[in-house]
């Protein structure tokens, strides 16, 4: 019985139109592209769309800083993004923008349906307002002192030191991140999406069994803490879509951004005559998958399905989340040259190298992927050049010189060929479940077997013996046949290498003809299929990245008219007395254990030795220390008489001291040699 092709729509998260594509973005787009290319090889009806996320305050402010319109800024970003994705052979059927007529119409339609169905509420809220810039300030554009732990220079929605969340109104000494002025409080009517009304549906969706276990578990935590109404409006000035019937009110960027998936697909539908409703209507039998990063799971697993449900559209079949990219075990860094832009990479290295390396490490779990530069060079050269391509080159020469490019009319080892083709469904299952690392492992194991076969048959020896022409042709043809099977399996990962292999083989690499050998087939002249990756290419990428970072810093210094309250060195705090200082009991503590708190993006948990007892302390320095275990054994300075604080993850019994501006720019304070745990700082 013939199986009907599946109808599938795939999206990637929308890159923000306020910056360049980097290798972190490329993890997701390569992951999705491999899956899409595999589905095409299997004969399924699949569409692959994306778009730029083109709205929001940061775009408005950056355009103003550059002296251009927001429309000009996002147009350039879109052109750059399309160029970079094409450079990595990402096979989108359409790449659009959320600042489009399709998105404007769909956003208004969905909002009006939600409103008509009673899911939009309004209430007057108090907000911080920048009187100099004449604008309300989003949470991330306010900074001040944390109301809980008193840490300075914290954002308006959460503290990076103690991980507390709060309202910008609660900040101590708030200031505008736009102008540096002290904001005032103003009231404004805002519109809210009634997310709690969808709790039952969301719980049922979570229990469907299709979501990744990490997402399902995280959603359960959110249910337990209680769903809240979601503010979907922003006040003018704002770059985005105006809310119908609400003067000077705009949709929050995260309201219209996911609708951008629908808008990009609608744009494709109108251009190619595809039925939009076949994929988006309630009750659709098409499959809908979103590939996203773990940082935006909240929006895609709660708000987005609820919005769709409330407006009469179908929900996603699944949401596939992945982790972050680290480089050599650390967070991507501009100063170290590891915050690598896609365009910088493409200036020096074949994109297929990165596609292969990511595939060799990607699985179906939400895990960070380490891009180890030394391992990158070794793996590409070992697997692709030394094993895979060499299999073709070491046999093609004999076929060309001795047999005019014609393959044998029989298989030299039918059992071995059957063993290779028998793995087709297992490898397909690995691709289907996004366990690319297992697929690559299986393919490379077969590649080793193919090379072992050639080593044992030794065609270079057979070629010197008289009367063994048929054997030589059969052995070398077998090597070419095995290469064809391997390249068929790798075609979703290495599309350009597959194209060159197809030109050499003079045959299309298809999943449905893997079992059909090219008996008596004539090959094209063999040309080099792939070049070795050299360390100097990696060095060039790193150096160019450093240079770009340095140039950007220099340009920023030139354009900065004057230091703001955010960029200047912080003034010395209010004078205190010696009696005030004496209240602080600061101690030297030895780190016995340090580990990341999985449920937090910012916290590390420390177990500290204070000489006569141990303590647990949580510290918001996760972004600065990617390998917390390396802190074990170090001496740190802590405030020992700070009242214990109950946090979500346990009790924090003190505060560890660090210096810096926050985020990844934090540095633990330590003591000189000779100190012991428990010593008092005087």
UniProtKB/Swiss-Prot annotation:
Binding residues for ATP: 334
Record carries keyword Kinase: no
Compartment list: Cytoplasm
Co-factor note (free text): Binds 1 zinc ion per subunit.
Motif ('KMSKS' region): 331-335
An example molecular function term from Gene Ontology annotations: ATP binding
Matching Gene3D superfamilies: HUPs, Isoleucyl-tRNA Synthetase, Domain 1, Methionyl-tRNA synthetase, Zn-domain, Nucleic acid-binding proteins
Enzyme Commission number(s) of this protein: 6.1.1.10
Assembly: Homodimer.
Function per UniProt: Is required not only for elongation of protein synthesis but also for the initiation of all mRNA translation through initiator tRNA(fMet) aminoacylation.
NCBIfam families (UniProt xref): metG, metG_C_term, PRK00133.1
Protein name per the record: Methionine--tRNA ligase
Taxonomy of the source species: Bacteria, Pseudomonadati, Pseudomonadota, Gammaproteobacteria, Pasteurellales
This protein's encoding gene: metG
